[in-house]
Amino acid sequence: MISREELGAKSAELGVDPSHVQQDYVAGWILAGLYGESPLGRQLVLKGGNALRKGYFGGTRFSEDLDFAITDRVNPAAFLDALNDVGRLAQARTGVQFHLEHTAQIGRERIKGAQTVYTFGMSFTDFYGRTETLPVSLHMDVTELTRLHLSPQSRSLIHPYSDHADCTADLTVMHLDEVLADKLKCLLQRQSIRDLFDLSHSILFNDEIPIDRKSVVSTFLRKTIFSPSPAAALNLLAAIPFEGMQGQWDDSIVCSRETRQDLTDTVTRWKDELRQLFADFRLGEQGQLAFFPAHLRTPIMDAGAQRKLLRLTYKGRTRLVEPYALRFKRREDGIGQEYLFIWDRTGGRSRPGIKSLLNYRIDDLAITDEPFEPRYEIELAKAGELTERPTFSQGPRHRTHTRIATRRPRPRPRRR
């Protein structure tokens, strides 16, 4: 284990709390054990923030979790056994005191179809030996049945501590272009300042590894519903309101003083960079009508996150609705469009219930102050995923070639 003096010096050098340095140090040893000693390492693909920090850019932000993809099913019991084996190994080599009796599966979430994310937790004693504080925890998310669009890469573990010669392993890491494609997708779905940081650090400020911008965007388009209309994705990305997120930037980004950038400058440069990222793709208006534009999408996403009702005017009627999902669906004639699935409290021509709405028939939309208790899972954070479920409960359909709406449909003649 690194000494308390090294821990304090590293914390002071980087300008981060010692707890983040402890987590980062232990994460390195867990990765070294998984990929260097455990058979489980042959199945795991490191992704997310620590794929960047431990596999590509040692100077990027700290990430408190380890995220893995696996193309097969997860065996929770086998994974727990492997974690405890790795914990015992790391404890013997470093002196870090793990609480292996508390290693556990602490979460399970079905995200789409049969795909599930399992969350596991390990804990260890604070390096300063403070028994009055809770043990420091390290979480690991494992997503099973993951489809990888690019071949993973082998990268040497980045472990910026004095025992780096002993803490070594060749990590299997998600391809850098796919990591950044995932960050673009998540940027649209959750509008997280951390995703902006990861993208800007990797694409704007990185001078270590060349970035294949075309590969990043083409992978992003294949992983989302926006392949038919790159322009729709570009416009949505450009409209994310980062300017109001200074507090999140200051509080949630844990990185060295040297790495931290000014948010205003980062946003300005990022919006300029977006045009360059999409420069090789067709950016006409063709197909944009099929997707909810930013001025509707942003309040819909906010209402779902806050569990607040929306008031909107649809086909000339004012409605009070509960928002649940944005899904890209294909009609029987092959036309594909994005639909907003809501519970309509007002009714209209029919009784209150589940309805699907098209963006170009909405005239006004605003978040109310009235909360609601969800009747279904709110799936708005999954907007943009490639899934075609016709109802809330039914499983995903197989993908097929889909045409998209390119103009407003002609109104049907009224019968007299």
Region roles according to the model:
Residues 1-44, 54-66, 70-294, 407-416:
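Structured mid-to-C-terminal alpha-helical surface segments
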Residues 46-50:
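Glycine-rich beta-strand-to-loop/alpha-helix junction loops that act as flexible
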Residues 135-151, 156-167, 289-416:
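Core beta-strand-centered patch of the WYL/Sm-like small regulatory domain
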